[in-house]
Amino acid sequence: MIIAALGHDIGHPGLTNTFQINASSEMAITYNDSSCLENFHLAKLFKTIRKEGTNIFEKLSSQDYKKIRKKMISEILATDMAVHGKILNNIRSKIPDYLLQEDNSNTSNKFELITDINNEETTNEEKQALFDYFIHSADLGHNTKNFDISLRWVELLSTEFWLQGDKEKAMNLTVSFLCDRDTTNVPKSQVGFIGGFIIPTYNFLVIMFPTLSYTIENAKNNLNRWQKLADEGRKKGWTPEKKKAIKNSSSKEKKNKIHKEAFLKRKTNIVEIKID
């Protein structure tokens, strides 16, 4: 699982699955519009691993290699947000109802009450469901860090999304959700994402590992910080120079030209979020 985590985004082009599919990209065609990026990362990771000098699995038997490869495929495919609901449902089904109550017993570690990965009676499917959940949760982990760290990740992700939006506009494609730098309200989107995805995901993790309760505390604190900004109507600070130029342009043609030029130049200045 550690190798899968290290390589789960290898070679990422900075463009989402939605873009790949809408653009009928080579990646989308290769992987039949199904978890395009995740399949691409897997292929690139295993091509890298099998090279001379980097083959960390070369001493394994063929049978053991197949087992590890199967596990890694499942884990990296689990980082596709399209399977988020399925992953949470799988984990929820393994947690006894009484553990979901706030007044449950304060054991130091409840993991063994759900499933013991060393128990021979635990099926391989159950074990893999846990590993998939762990890597999926870790992939969303920036929102469980303190606000300063989380904020930096939001800046980086927003920059990446908005560059994609610029490209979509230049290609006359539908602009993907959160990828329009002119209309995206970042505070509101963060409130929705943390409340709808992060906290429910990490609630299960904290049930299994109570010592990780700080992750939920950080997520709730981040949600409150973003909610405060949203309540204040703050979208300021998310206006790079290109957006300012577009706001001052009254011509649709001029706007399209600015978008296209910005993409072609691959302007990668990271958006700074000013919240003082």
Question: Where are the model-predicted features located?
Answer:
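Divalent metal-dependent phosphate-bond-processing catalytic cores, especially two-metal-ion Mg2+/Mn2+ enzymes
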Residues: 3-276
